[in-house]
From Swiss-Prot:
Localization of this protein: Cytoplasm, Cytosol; Cytoplasm; Nucleus
Protein name, as recorded: BTB/POZ domain-containing protein KCTD5
Name of the encoding gene: KCTD5
Organism: Bos taurus
Alphabetical GO biological process terms: proteasome-mediated ubiquitin-dependent protein catabolic process; protein homooligomerization
Biased composition (Basic and acidic residues): 220-234
GO molecular function: cullin family protein binding
Modified residues (N-acetylalanine): 2
UniProt-listed InterPro entries: BTB/POZ_dom, SKP1/BTB/POZ_sf, T1-type_BTB
Pfam families the UniProt entry points to: BTB_2 (PF02214)
Keywords assigned by UniProt, alphabetized: Acetylation, Cytoplasm, Nucleus
């Protein structure tokens, strides 16, 4: 006797199957679609197919913002061109990963964003669905994040390089990678057998490093390492 196997659909945070041990199969998903469309006590449920991932929620949740796309969807706005899939779910061609925070905001009024999601991505979805209160909330969060980043104190690193007069011009002209010339100090001259005296200098250079709020500053580039190595030989 042949067994019937279900083809599972992937679950999404906040979507169908979340907290139920995995995704729903296509047959079960279609069955829930019929329940969502059946008149009576279950008619308050609405199914959404967002980028291939199914979400189940209530009309009350989707109608939190009367000016939003989702409100118009629930009201069957004739000016809104919306299709349904074979299970009766509304088709929305958007990223399901970023729809989770949007739907949860409509559910409980709080903005919760996982660490692996960017605020800008949530803002894009909030603007698409035209949820004005969420748009303002995400923009405030982005401004707060950027403000903290701009207030990170600067760290100045200084290096002292020793060079001869003939090397001085080339060293200063080729200096890059954020290093700036600060001071030049003459330390006399050196004598090499068979050659003329060479004036020697100490060249002081500096660089500004931003201390990252999430960890140490980035590794110096190759040119910076060369300057550091030359300074360490003093």
């Amino acid at each position: 006797m042949a067994e019937n196997h279900c083809e599972l659909l992937p679950p999404a945070p906040g979507g169908l199957g979340a907290g139920l041990g995995g995704g729903l199969c296509r047959r079960c998903s279609a069955g829930l679609g019929a329940l969502a469309q059946r008149p009576g006590s279950v008619s308050k449920w609405v199914r959404l197919n967002v980028g291939g991932t199914y979400f189940l929620t209530t009309r009350q949740t989707l109608c939190r913002d009367p000016k939003s796309f989702l409100y118009r969807l629930c009201q069957a706005d004739p000016d809104l061109d919306s299709d349904k899939d074979e299970t009766g779910a509304y088709l929305i061609d958007r990223d399901p990963t970023y729809f989770g925070p949007v739907l949860n905001y409509l559910r409980h009024g709080k903005l919760v964003i996982n660490k692996d999601l960017a605020e800008e991505g949530v803002l894009e979805e909030a603007e698409f669905y035209n949820i004005t209160s969420l748009i303002k909330l995400v923009k405030d969060k982005i401004r707060e994040r950027d403000s903290k980043t701009s207030q990170v104190p600067l760290k100045h690193v200084y290096r002292v390089l020793q060079c001869q007069e003939e090397e001085l011009t080339q060293m200063v002209s080729t200096m890059s990678d954020g290093w700036k010339f600060e001071q030049l100090v003459s330390i006399g001259s050196s004598y090499n057998y068979g050659s003329e005296d060479q004036a020697e200098f100490l060249c002081v250079v500096s660089k500004e490093l931003h201390n990252s709020p999430h960890g140490p500053a980035s590794e110096p580039s190759e040119k910076a390492k060369i300057l550091q190595e030359r300074g360490s030989r003093m």
